[in-house]
Every structure is written in C-alpha cells, then in structure tokens.
Amino acid sequence: MTTRTISPEKTDDDYVESSLRPRALEDYIGQEKAKGNLRVFIDAARKRGEALDHVLLYGPPGLGKTTLANIIACEMGVNIKSTSGPVIERPGDLAAILTNLEPHDVLFIDEIHRLSHVVEEILYPAMEDFQLDIIIGQGPSARTIKLDLPRFTLVGATTRAGLLSSPLRDRFGVISRLEFYTDAELSTIVTRSAHILDIQIEPDGARELARRSRGTPRIANRLLRRVRDFAQVRADGVISAQVVDESLKLLEIDEKGFDQMDRTIMLTIIDKFGGGPVGLDTIAAAIGEERDTIEDVYEPFLIQHGFINRTPRGRVATKSAYEHFGRIAPAPGQGALF
C-alpha cells in the first residue's frame, strides 16, 4: 500500500504527533461519552486506591486510542508500557512484560486483535486473577506453577473489535467505542496543534482544514504540517482558507477529503460495476489493493459519510456518491452482482 497523506494509519511522518497529544482528560477534545465515562472510572479507582479496571478502546484508526491510553496512565499517576499484538509472538514475550509491571501500571497493547491464541491463553488468568501460569518441564513430568502479578490495568486498542475472541473481550470491564470527530471538534484540534507548533492559522483556515480531514485528528494534524509547508513557501506563512484550498488541490485532496485512492474505489464501483452491488474481493482485484486494507482503512469513512452502502450482496454506491462524481444514478433495482 502506498503512503497516503490522508491515511488514518500511522506513518513515519507522524513523529511530531506525540508532542501534540494532550496529557489530561480535560485537554482531550471530542469523544465526550467515552471521556465522561473514563473520568468517573478513573476518579473512583483513585479514591479506592485501586488499579483501574481493564479498558478496551475500539474504532477506526487515528481517532485517539493511543492518546487515551497515555492519558489514563497520566490521570492514574502510574507508568505505561506500550506494545502491540504482532510484537508479542510467544507466551514468553508476554510473560516478560507482565513480570516487569509495577502495581497499578498500565499495559497498552495496540492491535490487540492480532494476538495469537496461545498468547491470549496466558493473558486470561493475568487479567482475571493477576496470576501467570508457567509450565516447568516437558512431557509427563511437566508441572504448572502460578506466579502472582501486581494488579495492573490492561488497555487494549483495536480497529476490529469483531475479531476479538469472546473470552478476551469479556475480561474488559470498560469498553468504549471512539467515533469520527465533528468538523467543529477538528477545528479546535487544528487550532490547538497550530499553537503548539507555532503556526499562524486563521479561523476560516482551521475550519476548512477540519472539513477535509475525514473526521480524524491524525489526518488533521498531518494536513496541518503539509499546508504549513505550502504557506511558508508560496504564501506569507499564514494559513487561510484559500491557502488550505490551494495546497490541498496540489495534494489531490478534494472538498470532501477524498484522495486519489478514494476516487479510484468509488469510480470502480460506479463505472466498472454499474454502482454495485459488487463484492469486496472483486473491488480489491480491480484496483490492485488488499481486501483488508480497503475494509479497514478506506471503507469506514466512505460508509460513515454515506457514499457506500454495505449490503449482503456487496458494496453499493449511493446517490450522494453519484452526485459527488457528476454521474447519473441508475434507476432503482438496476445493478449487477459480481
């Protein structure tokens, strides 16, 4: 997959992102429901002098799951150890991490849905009983010993909650879904980030940038840095709505936040397959992209904003999609199955 300026996935260019992350819940913009619940749970745990219950954060990439995990640790006044599902390949890897935790520490596992079943089996007693089962020896003489662990908080993050096994999901006491951000929330985030990065941005520039950021703070911050470059070279260093529009045109990002890959997907459905329904595997083969990438990275935005309908027979382009691309929508009932 080629690198996209508006990809919600992390890129090497996002090294600046950590400096933009808030450190307290009161500074965290958006996600009011999740934030309000976490505030109650954190305050209650601190009053009792206990570790916070295990937390599962899920939703599309780039919405602030990692940021919230770090905020939880800061609010609890404890350390955080971060890793990801693909990195923990063997039970011994997880055991090494767990045995080095201090009481009430936060263990953050990104992409937790990618943990192997063998590693998950080790995690169950660790989450529920704060014990680690270690097998000594092999064969008939093998025996299991239980090692006590400090009470810790596991914060898991995933973009695909449906792939979590039921036993793992059931062990999380707090489950929060993160939603796409509103334009107003993103405008506030852009203004805050511009202040931290010492970038001059006008209110209309922040609003225009937010409108094209696909409801995702990571994309908004990345576009802010790209537009800053344009403003410094071709403008007076101040980001206005006009500067945003001109710079994003150069990046081939339209007024809806679509880039070339979004247009390729939508026009493939509309022009090649008559608007659908068309299967995801067929779309992937037609555009030369992986099925999972389309489903995880591209589709959430297109579905959320009403450009694609997901049906039992396949993906279907909506009336809004036809209007956006200047196409005439077919009469109801038309379309072929691929």
From Swiss-Prot:
Q: Which UniProt keywords apply?
A: ATP-binding, Cytoplasm, DNA damage, DNA recombination, DNA repair, DNA-binding, Hydrolase, Nucleotide-binding
> What Gene3D superfamilies does the entry give?
1.10.8.60, P-loop containing nucleotide triphosphate hydrolases, Winged helix-like DNA-binding domain superfamily/Winged helix DNA-binding domain
Alphabetically, the GO molecular function entries are: ATP binding; ATP hydrolysis activity; four-way junction DNA binding; four-way junction helicase activity
EC number, UniProt record:
3.6.4.-
Q: Where is this region: Small ATPAse domain (RuvB-S)?
A: 182-252
Binding-site residues, Mg(2+): T66
Instruction: State the SMART domains in the record.
Output: AAA
* Residues that coordinate or bind ATP: L20, R21, G62, K65, T66, T67, E128, D129, F130, R171, Y181, R218
User: Which Gene Ontology cellular-component terms appear in the entry?
Assistant: cytoplasm; Holliday junction resolvase complex
Q: Where is this region: Head domain (RuvB-H)?
A: 255-338
Name a single GO biological process: DNA recombination
Q: Which family does it belong to?
A: Belongs to the RuvB family.
Relate the protein's function as given in its record. Answer: The RuvA-RuvB-RuvC complex processes Holliday junction (HJ) DNA during genetic recombination and DNA repair, while the RuvA-RuvB complex plays an important role in the rescue of blocked DNA replication forks via replication fork reversal (RFR). RuvA specifically binds to HJ cruciform DNA, conferring on it an open structure. The RuvB hexamer acts as an ATP-dependent pump, pulling dsDNA into and through the RuvAB complex. RuvB forms 2 homohexamers on either side of HJ DNA bound by 1 or 2 RuvA tetramers; 4 subunits per hexamer contact DNA at a time.
| UniProt name for this protein | Holliday junction branch migration complex subunit RuvB
Give the organism the record lists. Geobacter sulfurreducens (strain ATCC 51573 / DSM 12127 / PCA)
Gene that encodes the chain? ruvB
